[in-house]
């Protein structure tokens, strides 16, 4: 049964309450598709009323933006550790392997960013969206800087271009390579099997080809 929380008074209490709600939403993410997770479902999982959720998040989309930041932070931290081991190697194959494997290991991050612009960046205030983008792009800049320390033969603009392509490839490839059951069944037909998308292979190839193209412009 849902319970109505006593209103949090201190900043610490508010932070703890919002984290509890985010944890509930995160648990649901491991069990259900994003489009099936409603604010009512999150409230039930957190054992609170829907009205209580609105005290900490202005909408479902706002809540998922905060989850995206958490997932982005985890992806970034793992990625930075792995990239430090490759500094100044200029090895396109290794950096592609690291970017692909780290993304595959952080499935929640890939799922969330695949619907970020089409779903989560709607029904939220300009203030919430601005704060989100500032934090999100700060995470990406850390990754860009780390990639630049590996691919020292590329300039900053080229590294930004590489990571922009990588990011949007993840956004597009993830849903295409993880179709809904109906599409999966259709792709099992022999005449449609060649439309299957291999996330790992496609992303890795894109990264390597992009690096090669950027290097050719240097020469």
Which role fits each region the language model picked out?
Residues 35-62, 66:
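Helix-turn-helix
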Residues 16, 20-27, 45, 62-85, ...:
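Alpha-helical structural segments
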Residues 1-33, 40-41, 45, 84-87:
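Basic, helix-initiating cap at the start of DNA-binding domains
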Residues 20, 41, 94-98, 161-168, ...:
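Amphipathic alpha-helical interaction segments
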Residues 151, 155-163:
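Membrane-interface starts of transmembrane alpha-helices
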Residues 2-5, 138-153, 169-219:
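C-terminal peripheral helix-coil segments that are non-catalytic and often amphipathic
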Residues 66, 81-109, 162-166:
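Hydrophobic alpha-helical connector segments
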Residues 105-127, 181-186:
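Amphipathic alpha-helical segments used for helix-helix packing
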């Amino acid at each position: 049964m849902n319970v109505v929380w006593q209103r949090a008074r201190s900043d610490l209490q508010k932070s703890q309450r919002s984290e509890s709600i985010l944890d509930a939403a995160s648990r649901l993410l491991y069990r259900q598709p994003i489009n099936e997770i409603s604010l009512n479902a999150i409230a039930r999982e957190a054992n609170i009323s829907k009205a209580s959720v609105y005290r900490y998040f202005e909408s479902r989309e706002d809540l998922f933006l905060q989850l995206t930041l958490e997932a982005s932070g985890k992806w970034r931290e793992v990625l930075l550790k792995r990239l430090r081991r490759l500094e100044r190697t200029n090895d396109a194959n290794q950096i592609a392997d690291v970017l692909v494997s780290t993304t595959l290991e952080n499935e929640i991050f890939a799922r969330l960013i695949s619907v970020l612009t089409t779903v989560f960046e709607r029904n939220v205030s300009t203030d919430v969206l601005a704060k989100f983008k500032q934090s999100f792009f700060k995470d990406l800049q850390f990754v860009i800087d780390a990639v630049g320390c590996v691919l020292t033969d590329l300039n900053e603009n080229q590294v930004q271009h590489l990571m922009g392509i990588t990011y949007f490839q993840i956004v597009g490839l993830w849903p295409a390579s993880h179709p809904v059951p109906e599409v999966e069944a259709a792709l099992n037909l022999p005449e449609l099997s060649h439309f299957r998308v291999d996330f790992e292979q496609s992303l890795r190839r894109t990264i390597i080809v992009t690096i090669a193209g950027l290097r050719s412009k240097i020469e």
